[in-house]
Amino acid sequence: MNPVRLALFAVMLLMVFCGPVLAQRSGPEFRRPLACEPLEPRTRLEAIESRYERVITKGFSHFATMTVRGIELRLDAIEMKDSTDSTRAIGLVIALWELGEKPRENRSFIDYQEIDRLLKGMESVARVNETITKLAGFEARYRTLGDLEINVFRQTRSGTAASLSSGICDRVTALLTLDDLEKLRGHIIEAKARLDEIK
């Protein structure tokens, strides 16, 4: 047999048998894709959480769990410490779980110094109504440094509603009533009062 034909035949066999192996994907990804991670931590709590080769301690108090339209929302007051250099941060963590066949979770950290701004932002967006514009629809939003986003908007038929979202790429969104938003605001005030005690 001709050596050129033999080489071509060998290359074809390699392509037929090795092609499917090369086309297979690697195992599951447990971390968010790199494009979803901010280059630098945006809150003090995230800065401590993202450290490696350190002992990080966390203390937390649970303040509320709300289930609204297939989303479970959890609010905790949190304290984190890095035992290596005595760095300490306190604040809130709000986690959203999307219930169902493929549950998803996302959470947002809110530093203590940002809580008052969050409360004012929640109060401001909750007061927004159709008088802010002469157009048919309206929307107001407030976003924290840790990517917790609160929206208040006009629904087509049923008046004003709110939403709470967490995350960068794979966002989890809870649809709320204005009463739900006010309850959450009350729980945040309670959690801040607890953090004031340990500040």
What kind of feature is each model-predicted range?
Residues 7-17:
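Bacterial N-terminal signal peptides
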